[in-house]
A protein has these predicted regions:
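C-terminal (or distal) subdomains of carbohydrate-active enzymes
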Residues: 1-179
């Protein structure tokens, strides 16, 4: 648990022995004014562009600020994932509800919360639970099957109990449905 001003931030890390992946689940009680909460991740990947998931595909953006146009695009919208890759390996960040990213040189930035005063002075105040995941892969995001992994991360399987066909009983059956 960490504190920032009047806010409380808890991060849980999950490591998987059979995957090149780890997850970070965040629980944040946010009570700040005029603060942008970002997380930064330095990576050992050197490339001139990063790939961002957008609504009907993906888009590449530079990882440097050579022009005023590059500098103005300090943050890029991405839906489910971003990827930074060299020729034969890379890292992708998957998310379940955060959409503002930056990649500058070899540092990935993720905007977690923003407490602005306009248009809604209460925006992002209160309790938040969200997760993101880091996936290491060979090749680029296509070789790493990142699109499928991002969909699986956003739509995990959930086990639910099934009622008996006649509707009688306590409502708990012995058969599971997976959706």
């Amino acid at each position: 648990m960490d504190r920032y001003g009047n806010s409380e931030i808890v991060q849980y890390l999950y490591f998987y022995p059979d995957q090149y992946r780890f997850d970070i689940r965040n629980e944040i009680d946010w009570a700040e004014d005029h603060v942008l909460l970002r997380d930064y991740f330095p990576v050992d990947i050197h490339t001139n562009e990063a790939t961002f998931d957008i609504q009907y595909g993906n888009v590449k953006r530079p990882t440097h600020y050579n022009t005023s146009w590059d500098f103005a695009r300090f943050e890029v919208c991405a839906h489910k994932w971003i990827d930074v890759s060299e020729d034969n390996y890379g890292i992708s960040v998957l998310n379940d509800c955060k959409y503002g990213y930056s990649v500058h040189d070899s540092v990935i930035g993720l905007t977690m919360l923003k407490s602005s005063s306009y248009p809604n002075p209460d925006a992002d105040r209160g309790h938040h639970t969200f997760s993101y995941s880091f996936c290491l892969h060979e090749g680029d995001f296509r070789d790493g099957d990142i699109v499928s992994k991002a969909y699986a991360f956003n739509n995990p399987c959930k086990a639910v109990t099934k009622q008996e066909k006649n509707g009688k009983g306590n409502g708990v059956g012995s058969v599971f449905d997976f959706c």
